[in-house]
């Protein structure tokens, strides 16, 4: 598969496939690093495609096995003068694998062959201005809201400005595809679901924000979730905007 950044929630996406067996063993060792204690708003949503609705959510008794593909870090848009710095990859990869395991998505092996390929991307996107217009607005919103830019929950009305913000953001995107060894033009990658989590980058480097982003995205893995705003304070996670799980008509 060729490497390509995520955009929206199409039915297919080619990503960079890597040899991951040895890396997977490494990622399963260790634990999450300490999360920052500062309050911040985070937007979470998950798109589920029509093919994705045919897959039953994994359980402890019947987990789903996957091949991980780490698209990794990207800096998109304009150059940010503040709070833009590449974090180390390994702790993020480890945290993502552990988060997926909490939702019963486990790395595949010879004993347990894969049914999924799960691609993980993180980074920072900054607006590009031309004559006071943000010309990469669609790209920013694709990473924040996916395919659900007009599907806010009623309780999220007060946070519409946060969800539609075009200021610079740190983001995490986790995408699940039906597994195949080698996609072709006749048999392209089939997207099943894509989870998005993002937060404004002002005040924190991505290294400080990524673990809370993974934490708030975890319950939304594989579950149709309307865009919702979650507030993290120093005592833990407090849900303010309701991330409503429901059946969505996404093709």
Task: Label each region the model flagged.
Residues 1-17:
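N-terminal secretory signal peptides that target proteins for export/translocation
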Residues 19-31:
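Bacterial N-terminal signal peptides
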Residues 33-93, 97-98, 110-116, 120-133, ...:
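A structural "domain/chain start" motif
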Residues 62-64, 103, 114-116, 168-173, ...:
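Envelope-exposed proteins and targeting segments
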Residues 76-89, 104-106, 160-162, 196-204:
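Second-shell loop/turn segments in exported
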Residues 102-115, 225-233:
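Surface-exposed patches in mature extracellular/periplasmic domains of secreted proteins
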Residues 121-184:
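Surface-exposed short loop/turn segments
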Residues 155-160, 170-230:
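Short secondary-structure boundary motifs at beta->alpha junctions and helix caps
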């Amino acid at each position: 598969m060729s490497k390509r950044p995520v955009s929206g929630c199409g039915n297919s996406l080619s990503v960079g496939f890597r040899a991951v067996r040895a890396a997977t063993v490494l990622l399963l060792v260790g634990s999450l690093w300490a999360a920052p204690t500062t309050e911040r708003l985070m937007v979470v949503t998950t798109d589920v495609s029509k093919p994705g609705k045919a897959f039953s959510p994994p359980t402890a008794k019947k987990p789903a096995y996957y091949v991980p593909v780490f698209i990794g870090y990207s800096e998109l848009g304009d150059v940010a003068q503040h709070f833009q710095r590449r974090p180390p990859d390994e702790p993020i990869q480890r945290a993502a694998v552990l988060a997926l395991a909490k939702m019963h998505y486990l790395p595949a092996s010879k004993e347990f062959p894969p049914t999924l390929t799960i691609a993980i991307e993180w980074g920072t996107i900054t607006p590009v201005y031309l004559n006071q217009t943000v010309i990469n607005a669609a790209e920013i919103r694709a990473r924040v809201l996916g395919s659900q830019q007009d599907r806010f929950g009623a309780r999220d009305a007060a946070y519409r400005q946060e969800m539609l913000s075009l200021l610079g953001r740190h983001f995490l995107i986790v995408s699940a595809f039906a597994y195949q060894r080698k996609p072709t033009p006749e048999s392209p990658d089939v997207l099943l679901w894509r989870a998005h989590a993002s937060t404004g980058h002002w005040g924190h480097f991505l290294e400080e924000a990524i673990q809370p982003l993974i934490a708030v995205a975890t319950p939304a893995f594989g579950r149709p979730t309307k865009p919702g705003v979650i507030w993290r304070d120093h005592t833990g996670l407090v849900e303010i905007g309701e991330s409503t799980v429901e059946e969505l008509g996404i093709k």
